[in-house]
Swiss-Prot record:
GO terms for molecular function: translation release factor activity, codon specific. Keywords: Cytoplasm, Methylation, Protein biosynthesis. Its main location: cytoplasm. The lineage of its organism: Bacteria, Pseudomonadati, Pseudomonadota, Alphaproteobacteria, Sphingomonadales. Gene3D superfamilies: 3.30.160.20, 3.30.70.1660, 6.10.140.1950. This is Peptide chain release factor 1. It comes from Erythrobacter litoralis (strain HTCC2594). SUPFAM superfamilies: Release factor. The keyword Cytoplasm applies. It holds the Pfam family RF-1.
Length: 355
């Protein structure tokens, strides 16, 4: 994709303008915050745009040198090398210029729920949580559990955690969907392979200004927290259930002994789910953009299979199979899958632009 020279100049001028504003020392408050965001977003684009412009100018200079018999051989060699490298650099620029998802730099709410497969599904949900926890550690992110429903055999029936850091949602958003595991359970004496599943949802966490919640739209119920088998785990009414009446979204929280802490956590989850609901509505109005994404974005879509006997992980959306199951489930190896999904998404969006 060839970017016009006028567009390169526009990028350079806009970046120079932002640099001057940032250096002026006159920006304060929200104006400074917005300018900083604009600068951080434009900087990588401006860097690649400058490289493309320099390569094009160098091609022009080398073409003039072809008229000089003494310089012709050297100029031809350098010209061939730059002409070969330029299309890839222009592709990098086109990717850098793709419209950004406004949520990409937001923290995320990670929700993992055991699906079909009983105890084995709960154990797998635990494996997935630890995989994301270790991957997050490698990225320098922070993971804080918000609520959990542990299984009696280990793992989780459900766990919700907050993941914060740089570029969290951008890297984790393609993890939403049904993850399937094929392995022999430890309790299986006959050595038969069982298939079970867990559902992962990754939701961007909104800023306060992104979602406004009116108290009159909420129905709040307070009740006594209960544990496995229905026994009460607290002698006071500390569990909280919040229903958002306009959307019907219901959030329950009972992990903390304090009603106030449970309410605060429930509101955090509600705000995130409401923001996700609003994003889905707007994406529904932008069907073409959504169609260009990797996969359907539907959280009921089976996206990945982890086959333990064969030591392989297959991502069904991009047809990628990696025989690195141990490395992936341990956390560090997940980066290769994440990178492949991001690259495929960029390629699809580039193709959609050129149609």
């Amino acid at each position: 994709m060839t970017i016009p020279a006028t567009r390169l100049d526009q990028i350079a001028n806009r970046f120079a303008e932002l640099e001057a504003r940032m250096a002026s020392g006159t920006l304060e408050g929200e104006e400074f915050v917005q300018a900083s965001r604009d600068y951080a977003e434009l900087e990588p684009v401006a860097k690649v745009a400058a490289e493309v412009k320099a390569m094009r100018e160098e091609i022009g200079g080398l073409e003039e040198m072809l008229a000089d018999p003494e310089m012709k051989a050297m100029a031809q060699e350098e010209l061939a090398a730059i002409r070969e490298a330029l299309p890839e650099k222009e592709r990098q620029l086109a990717i850098a210029m793709l419209p950004k998802d406004s949520a990409d730099n937001k923290p995320a709410m990670l929700e993992i729920r055991a699906g079909t497969g009983g105890d084995e599904a709960a154990l797998f949900a635990g494996d997935l949580y630890r995989m994301y926890e270790r991957f997050a550690g490698e990225q320098g992110w922070k993971v804080e559990p918000v609520s959990m429903n542990a299984s009696e055999v280990g793992g989780f029936k459900e766990i919700v955690a907050n993941v914060s850091g740089t570029g969290v949602f951008a890297k984790l958003k393609f993890e939403s969907g049904v993850h399937r595991v094929q392995r022999v359970p430890e309790t299986e004496s006959g050595g038969r392979i069982h298939t079970s599943a867990a559902t992962v949802a990754v939701l961007p966490e909104p800023d306060e200004v992104d979602v406004q919640i009116d108290d009159k739209d909420l129905k709040i119920d307070i009740y006594r927290a209960s544990g496995a088998g229905g026994q009460h785990v607290n002698t006071t009414d500390s569990a909280v259930r919040i229903t958002h009446l306009p959307t019907g979204i219901v959030v329950q929280q009972q992990d903390e002994r304090s009603q106030h802490k449970n309410k605060a956590k429930a509101m955090q989850v509600l705000r995130t789910r409401l923001y996700d609901h609003l994003r889905e509505q707007s994406q529904g109005e932008e069907a073409a953009a959504r169609k260009a994404m990797v996969g359907s974005g539907d959280r009921s879509e089976r996206i990945r299979t982890y086959n333990f006997p064969q030591g392989r992980v297959t991502d069904h959306r991009i047809g990628l199979t990696l025989h690195k199951l141990d490395e992936i489930i341990a956390g560090p190896g997940l980066g290769e899958l994440v990178g492949a999904l991001i690259a495929e998404d960029e390629a699809k969006r580039l193709a959609a632009l050129s149609e």
